[in-house]
Curated annotation (Swiss-Prot):
Organism: Rhodococcus opacus (strain B4)
Alphabetized GO MF terms: translation elongation factor activity
Gene that specifies this protein: efp
Keywords: Cytoplasm, Elongation factor, Protein biosynthesis
Main localization category: cytoplasm
PANTHER family referenced in this protein's UniProt entry, alphabetically: ELONGATION FACTOR P, ELONGATION FACTOR P (EF-P) FAMILY PROTEIN
Keyword flag Hydrolase: no
NCBIfam families: efp (TIGR00038), PRK00529.1 (NF001810)
Descriptive protein name: Elongation factor P
Protein function: Involved in peptide bond synthesis. Stimulates efficient translation and peptide-bond synthesis on native or reconstituted 70S ribosomes in vitro. Probably functions indirectly by altering the affinity of the ribosome for aminoacyl-tRNA, thus increasing their reactivity as acceptors for peptidyl transferase.
Family to which the UniProt record says this protein belongs: Belongs to the elongation factor P family.
Length: 187
């Protein structure tokens, strides 16, 4: 059980027999009436996102979630194969469970796999990942029709928007949560 004051991003709640993870939350104290907590919850299995409001101080069931450090090995059809660094056990996780983070995963990347009762729930990548630009068009000096950005394809196949000065072969820092360009890595 957790109180609304214990809410934080990533906390997994058990509501009506389903597992939901908190993606956003905000404590609200209106001028009139009691305080409450506004949340965005993501269903762990289906990926559906809903808005839910809790009265302040309400107790909510939490799920026991184990986070294990693992290494991403390879992609096999519709599954991703991960290895536990301690036991060398390999597990197969479906594309749906891995989610959007798959577009930023490189082989041998260290990730965290969250499990509930030995069932993989989701995969957490490092917040920032370093990836090489496979292809991007040369940026034309003075071209501002695109707001100073252009598309670039990364070594994983993901496509993100980057500033005009980025060239093919540059190593970039990318936010794995939303795919935003963070900067160039100095070689």
């Amino acid at each position: 059980m957790a109180s609304t004051s214990d809410f934080k991003n990533g906390l997994v709640l058990q509501i009506e027999g389903q597992l939901w993870t908190i993606t956003e939350f905000q404590h609200v104290k209106p001028g009139k009436g009691p305080a409450f907590v506004r949340t965005k919850l993501k269903n762990v299995l289906s990926g559906k996102v809903v808005d839910k409001t809790f009265n302040a101080g309400v107790k909510v069931d939490t799920a026991t979630v184990d986070r294990r450090d693992m290494t991403y090995l390879y992609h096999d059809g519709t599954d991703y194969i991960f290895m536990d660094g301690d036991t060398y056990d390999q597990i197969s996780i479906s594309e749906a469970t891995v989610g959007d983070g798959a577009r930023f995963m490189l082989e041998n990347m260290a990730v965290q796999v969250a499990t509930h009762e030995d069932v993989p729930l989701f995969v957490e990548l490092p917040v920032t990942v370093e990836l090489v630009v496979q292809h991007t068009d040369p940026g034309l000096q003075g071209d501002r029709s695109t707001g100073g950005t252009k598309p670039a394809t990364l070594e994983t196949g993901a496509e993100i928007n980057v500033p005009l000065f980025i060239n093919t072969g540059d190593k970039l820092k990318v936010d794995s949560r939303d795919g935003n360009y963070l900067g160039r890595v100095n070689s």
